[in-house]
Swiss-Prot record:
UniProt family annotation: Belongs to the 2Fe2S plant-type ferredoxin family.
Sequence intervals crossing the membrane: none
PANTHER family from the UniProt entry: FERREDOXIN (PTHR43112), FERREDOXIN-2, CHLOROPLASTIC (PTHR43112:SF3)
Keyword Acetylation assigned: yes
Keyword line: 2Fe-2S, Acetylation, Electron transport, Iron, Iron-sulfur, Metal-binding, Transport
Protein's organism: Halobacterium salinarum (strain ATCC 700922 / JCM 11081 / NRC-1) (Halobacterium halobium)
Function: Ferredoxins are iron-sulfur proteins that transfer electrons in a wide variety of metabolic reactions.
InterPro entries: 2Fe-2S_ferredoxin-like_sf, 2Fe-2S_ferredoxin-type, 2Fe2S_fd_BS, 2Fe2S_Ferredoxin, Beta-grasp_dom_sf
Pfam families: Fer2
Protein name, as recorded: Ferredoxin
Residue numbers binding [2Fe-2S] cluster: C64, C69, C72, C103
Cofactor(s), by name: [2Fe-2S] cluster
Length: 129
């Protein structure tokens, strides 16, 4: 079963960390963050990451659950996430900026690292509901 290591973008921002820090997840592991802001979870084959987070009792952001907004956006830092059809992200955002939507995204690697709650990034703001 794939494992997703996750970090809340708001926590990254509050701590003054940079999305491109090589040791971003090590810093998060050492920071004593609560389980909703940083941790790992198993995601069943074909299960959406947002659903897995909710099954853990986490209140991750979402709105449409259909890939039509950017409320649940995350940035893939390691591994790969397959998404169902979506209409909101540009090819550049998916291919170069590694943006994925957790409401329609499932891990496509045994280990995936994401920064969720990425809706706060400037280039996604105009697609948040």
């Amino acid at each position: 079963m794939p494992t997703v290591e996750y970090l809340n973008y708001e926590t990254l921002d509050d701590q003054g960390w940079d999305m491109d820090d090589d040791d971003l997840f090590e810093k998060a592991a050492d920071a004593g963050l609560d389980g909703e802001d940083y941790g790992t979870m198993e995601v069943a084959e074909g299960e959406y990451i947002l659903e897995a987070a909710e099954a853990q009792g986490y209140d991750w952001p979402f709105s449409c659950r259909a890939g039509a907004c950017a409320n649940c956006a995350s940035i893939v830092k390691e591994g790969e996430i397959d998404m169902d059809m979506q209409q909101i992200l540009s090819d550049e955002e998916v291919e170069e900026k590694d943006v994925r939507l957790t409401c329609i995204g499932s891990p496509a690697a045994d280990e995936v690292k994401i920064v969720y709650n990425a809706k706060h990034l400037d280039y996604l703001q105009n697609r948040v509901i």
